[in-house]
Design a protein with these regions (language model features):
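A glycine-rich beta-to-alpha transition motif near the start of alpha/beta enzyme domains, typified by
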Residues: 1-154
Length: 154
């Protein structure tokens, strides 16, 4: 029996609102998955455990519901006045398909925390105590989203 080789990719499983998803820093993905296309889609499908003809996603991080079959890819934004760029993928449970056309407001609520903890936000924008305002470019829908993240003791 032959097995595909495994690679290590840093990621965080996060909850935002009623949804859960796997968050990635774009620069941590393999080169082939840093650009849109089949390699990126196949990686997201594999991580979530899709397609699963039984609808269970037992071989991945998905939990067999549309609210838990999600991925987020973040990077520093190249746009002025934005801290991070956010790409959202809704992963089908039973089909080999990732929908990159929409956004998940629930997981967007977790983007600021991930961006700060991953070092994607300039440290000068993060108070020791108070509220950090994070400007997100949501690449799927081409909109600016502003989130506020409470900070205690840095």
């Amino acid at each position: 029996m032959t097995y595909l080789s495994q690679i290590k990719i840093p990621a965080i499983y996060m909850r935002g609102g009623t949804s859960k998803g796997v968050f990635f820093n774009l620069s941590d993905l393999p080169d082939s998955a840093q650009v849109p296309g089949t390699a990126r889609d196949n990686l997201m499908l594999r991580v979530i455990g899709s397609p699963d003809p039984y609808g269970k996603q037992t071989d991945g991080m998905g939990s067999a519901t549309s609210s838990t079959s999600k991925t987020v890819i973040l990077s520093k934004s190249s746009l002025a006045d934005h801290d991070v760029a956010h790409l959202f993928g809704q992963v089908s449970i039973v089909k080999a398909y990732v929908d990159w056309s929409g956004n998940c407001g629930n997981l967007t609520a977790a983007v600021g925390s991930f961006a700060i903890s991953s070092g994607l936000v300039d440290a000068t924008h993060i108070p020791e105590n108070g509220t950090a305002t994070i400007r997100i470019w949501q690449a799927n829908i081409k909109k600016t989203i502003v989130v506020q993240v409470p900070i205690t003791n840095g």
